[in-house]
Amino acid sequence: MNAVQKEIRLYGLEQHQGIIDGIIQELGLEDYAFDIRLILIEAITNAYYHGNLSDCTKPIIVRYLLSGKRLELQVEDSGEGSGSLVFPEAISGDELLDEGGRGLYLIRCFSDKAEMVRNTMYISKCVCPT
């Protein structure tokens, strides 16, 4: 299997769900569609609101690489990336109904590895048969 590596640039959130569905279809990862869709929706939404401060003139860059059984995702915003970002291991019952704050937790739960380096979120997921 040849590695597939691409980059997509988007502005705002109007077309991100269609782009995500296109990535899943292009890579033939329909069996993992729920996980990948959830991961990318949360990462792109986080980049838009927190990195780009809801400015739809600033790009969000999504890079993806499928090599063998490993899917590598990068979501880069246009922010300064100076703050620290923690992917929580758990959320309390009180936080379950909060307006925000679950996105990073969900990314952590549905990926094998997630970290933020400056203004880029790096996410890794095994797409091997169970």
Question: Where would I find each of the regions flagged by the language model?
Answer:
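Flexible, glycine-/charge-rich segments associated with ATP-binding catalytic modules
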Residues: M1-G12, R108-T130
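Bergerat-fold GHKL ATPase/HATPase_c domain
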Residues: M1-L38
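Conserved ATP-binding N-box helix of the HATPase_c
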Residues: D31-C56
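A conserved short beta-strand within the histidine kinase catalytic ATPase domain
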Residues: T57-L65
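Short beta-strand-loop-beta element adjacent to the nucleotide/active-site pocket used for signaling
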Residues: L65-L73
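Glycine-rich/acidic phosphate-handling loop/turn and adjacent ATP-lid/helix
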Residues: L73-G100
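Glycine-rich phosphate-binding loop
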Residues: L96-S111
